Amino acid sequence: MKKLSFQQIILTLQNYWQDYGCAILQPYDAHVGAGTFHPATVLRCLGSKPWSVAYVQPSRRPGDSRYGMHPNRMQHYYQFQVILKPSPDNIQELYLKSLECLGIDLKAHDIRFVEDDWKSPTLGAAGLGWEVWCDGMEVSQFTYMQQIGGIECKLVAGEITYGLERLALYIQGIDEVKELDWNGQTGEKALKYGEVDFEAERQFSKFNLEFADSEMLLRHFKDSEEQCERLVEANLPLPAYDYCLNASHYFNLLNSRGIISVTERASYVLKVRHLAKICCMKWLEMSGE
């Protein structure tokens, strides 16, 4: 069987979960640290209405900046997120079948669910969870979402997060992300991951670690915090959540620049968590929950 390219992995997962009944959404157009931060997860996992979606989410973690020199750690990467609410009884079986669709022979490889309960301090979110290992390498995170914004979820959602780069490294048998086959073409049309993303990786690493203006970031954090609170008061939880995401990203940039102390870091986490909570509470209020 021909090894899937990076984009074929995405298309295969989209088709698989579409056939199951998920709506295929688009990435959220904001700086987020993981697919979980998409409002399709944070807000829609709350309340009593069923919700089944899947989407790719480009994600940023400034603290993982390596100037494009690390074989598998980047400040920008891609996740494929699946939310099944309520979580079906056979969710693990569904996940394993998705791996088979990607060409992974479950009988020939060691697939393990390693207990790893998940939490996001800035989102005030938590759930029972497992890392999924394939021959000793983590390729996915599996979580039963129980709390978001400090609010208990009425219906427990099953969240599956595929680490697309790690999955592609495994499927293609390659050691470095930049060498991944992006489009499955040959000759002049062939593209590697590095040709698509690694100049941006180099430049944004320099920005994240060297050029991000700390005073400006501090101002932007405070402005985002205040704007979020004003929008919640105005019954606009969706734009308010955008500013919560902005505040979270500015906090991550400040952290990557080494500007904030350990004590200050805890304070910033609480501030972002408060913003997430008031957005979630207002969303539920306006949804009639």
Swiss-Prot record:
GO terms, molecular function: ATP binding; glycine-tRNA ligase activity
Top-level taxon of origin: Bacteria
TM annotation in the entry: none
One GO CC annotation: cytosol
EC number(s) reported in the record: 6.1.1.14
InterPro entries: aa-tRNA-synth_II/BPL/LPL, Gly-tRNA-synth_heterodimer, Gly-tRNA_ligase_asu
Subcellular location: Cytoplasm
Keyword Nucleotide-binding annotated: yes
Keywords: Aminoacyl-tRNA synthetase, ATP-binding, Cytoplasm, Ligase, Nucleotide-binding, Protein biosynthesis
Chief site of localization: cytoplasm
Catalytic activity line of the entry: tRNA(Gly) + glycine + ATP = glycyl-tRNA(Gly) + AMP + diphosphate
Gene Ontology biological process terms from the UniProt entry: glycyl-tRNA aminoacylation
PROSITE patterns recorded: AA_TRNA_LIGASE_II_GLYAB
PANTHER family named in the record: GLYCINE--TRNA LIGASE, CHLOROPLASTIC_MITOCHONDRIAL 2, GLYCYL-TRNA SYNTHETASE
Family recorded in the similarity comment: Belongs to the class-II aminoacyl-tRNA synthetase family.
Subunit structure: Tetramer of two alpha and two beta subunits.
Stated name of the protein: Glycine--tRNA ligase alpha subunit
Lineage: Bacteria, Pseudomonadati, Pseudomonadota, Alphaproteobacteria, Rickettsiales
